[in-house]
Amino acid sequence: MIIRSPEPEVKILVDRDHIKTSFEEWARPGHFSRTLAKGPDTTTWIWNLHADAHDFDSHTSDLEEISRKVFSAHFGQLSIIFLWLSGMYFHGARFSNYEAWLSDPTHIGPSAQVVWPVVGQEILNGDVGGGFRGIQITSGFFQIWRASGITSELQLYCTAIGALIFAALMLFAGWFHYHKAAPKLAWFQDVESMLNHHLAGLLGLGSLSWAGHQVHVSLPINQFLNAGVDPKEIPLPHEFILNRDLLAQLYPSFAEGATPFFTLNWSKYADFLTFRGGLDPVTGGLWLTDIAHHHLAIAILFLIAGHMYKTNWGIGHGLKDILEAHKGPFTGQGHKGLYEILTTSWHAQLSLNLAMLGSLTIVVAHHMYSMPPYPYLATDYGTQLSLFTHHMWIGGFLIVGAAAHAAIFMVRDYDPTTRYNDLLDRVLRHRDAIISHLNWACIFLGFHSFGLYIHNDTMSALGRPQDMFSDTAIQLQPVFAQWIQNTHALAPGATAPGATTSTSLTWGGGDLVAVGGKVALLPIPLGTADFLVHHIHAFTIHVTVLILLKGVLFARSSRLIPDKANLGFRFPCDGPGRGGTCQVSAWDHVFLGLFWMYNAISVVIFHFSWKMQSDVWGSISDQGVVTHITGGNFAQSSITINGWLRDFLWAQASQVIQSYGSSLSAYGLFFLGAHFVWAFSLMFLFSGRGYWQELIESIVWAHNKLKVAPATQPRALSIVQGRAVGVTHYLLGGIATTWAFFLARIIAVG
């Protein structure tokens, strides 16, 4: 007889018909809160409604219910993303010059928006070349579409409709997984299964399918486009997929099918999976065959990674075991207890994810220009500047968000009674040492970095250029950075024998790549000017970290307010009768951190914009002479504060200031309007609550006199609300001002 082990019981991991679908309930403002559902007494109600609508912690303390709401909201978010993407593709299909751009990307600018001629507004439609009049776009969509093999506006229509269908599907999924089949808490906490699906499914199969698309569709179509074939003559994507002979004409190894794969003769496939390095001289982008190879390799790694964790089969790693085994000689209990934190506090989990994703986004910003992935991206200076700026801002916001949710975790989810001598506890116990040392580093960096500039301004003002820190007087060369550049420039042949050129032209060693008489990329020299501004970067980043980290480490208690945890994540002051305890909540640290994040990112994008215009971007003559946009003035001008003001801000603002009456005039209006939005923020940041309450009561008196007083009592914004409105307008105004300044400048001169 055969003895079988008993079949493992399958766990039921969903609740059916968990919560009924009720439009009546959703139509009641504030239905998620007993207090808010009563309706407004004062105008504070509308602010609380916005503040608490998505604060699921405040609706219920049931972790399972909170998890389900977050999960469902994610589908709503995905739906909006698909809707947005669909809109972008629809604009490309309906309003753009994509097909014209595809036929001549060096002389025709990308445009996907035409302004209706209402009372002279058609002035905004500039000539982007090829007889098309519209607004020049700088989002990089045209370049992505070309890289993915889209050759007609009909294909864009089809994709737009597909994205709409997916948006509807996501909306349905969000409803279904909350109201019809809601996952149980155990499902959300099953981290090994989640890792397997995310690694092998999303990243592994996602990369594999993209590699497949690139090999079978993008590569052959781009090969034809690069050879100058008319897009209308190129076979359609399905023809390449269904007809192997068609591909074999371009890539001979296709004739052999899968035989080389199974006989391990993989080098046969080197005609479409390459390892070249550097840029394609035709398009100024990375070799698409390198990119396909990269995605195939990434897919293999993640497919393997997705099979490492123990699920139903009792084989593989358990995350709890990994964390608890992670102990160093000086770290006490090490990571013990972190597993429980990360499976019961979604704020802690989100905090880590935001920190990682924020850092990754900033890495993306730096790779988009140094290794431009799409065809004709590198010579589209407006798009290059926009992509760098966009990814820097997004990265900054995500990192501040990481600190915000770390602090919320500390206040709402941290249980000091169960934590002893693990890493988090040890960090909290020596927080004074951490913060005071970090503070010292900030003071040192601030005085020394600004001191170098002040010295240069003083020497310059006194007419003593020989005593300045510059490449031509007292040199402060960034020797470590230059060493790293040099190492990378020499790497091919030494560390990566298959590669013909280094990963990025910026390292040096190579020649410049120019497309259609414009510089795509060249080796970027670093000198004293970069050394100086680099230390400003170090200073602003350290101060941002100081503010955010102090907020997290002192979120629960401090010498000033030992019972801070009881006051919550955001509070104005420690009650009446305790002076000097305002602006100490964890929320206030996020508020202050946002301003320093804004400082830090502003210096970075200014550095990038000027450096690229001065030392990289420009035109090249038939004799091979490069003329940069600002003629290499960065090295000598940016070493004084006066130089930044005069030769960057003022000199380069001339395009936006003089844009009235031209197709760039919208940027001039935005520049003005965004300054107003920014200035408006100061009204909220500089005046106290009592001032406004007094004013309101005077206005209410006037309304009463005229018998037009509303039933809902007007109230001044609370201290926290006023700060939130202030910082929002400060950042919005500042970012929109920078956007208008950058784009008017680069579209005019680039």
Swiss-Prot record:
| Record field: transmembrane | 70-93, 156-179, 195-219, 291-309, 346-369, 385-411, 433-455, 531-549, 589-610, 664-686, 724-744
Kindly state one GO CC term assigned in the UniProt record. Answer: chloroplast thylakoid membrane
Q: Which InterPro entries match?
A: PSI_PsaA (IPR006243), PSI_PsaA/B (IPR001280), PSI_PsaA/B_CS (IPR020586), PSI_PsaA/B_sf (IPR036408)
Q: Which reaction does it catalyse?
A: reduced [plastocyanin] + hnu + oxidized [2Fe-2S]-[ferredoxin] = oxidized [plastocyanin] + reduced [2Fe-2S]-[ferredoxin]
Q: Where is this chain's protein located in or outside the cell?
A: Plastid, Chloroplast thylakoid membrane
> Which positions does UniProt annotate for chlorophyll a' binding?
675
Give the membrane topology, semicolon-separated if more than one. Multi-pass membrane protein
Residues bound to phylloquinone are 692
Note whether 4Fe-4S occurs among the keywords. Answer: yes
Kindly list the positions annotated as binding [4Fe-4S] cluster: 573, 582
EC number of the protein: 1.97.1.12
Residues the record lists as binding chlorophyll a: 683, 691
UniProt-listed Pfam families: PsaA_PsaB (PF00223)
Q: What does this protein do?
A: PsaA and PsaB bind P700, the primary electron donor of photosystem I (PSI), as well as the electron acceptors A0, A1 and FX. PSI is a plastocyanin-ferredoxin oxidoreductase, converting photonic excitation into a charge separation, which transfers an electron from the donor P700 chlorophyll pair to the spectroscopically characterized acceptors A0, A1, FX, FA and FB in turn. Oxidized P700 is reduced on the lumenal side of the thylakoid membrane by plastocyanin.
**Identification of the protein by name:** Photosystem I P700 chlorophyll a apoprotein A1
Q: What is the primary gene name for this protein?
A: psaA
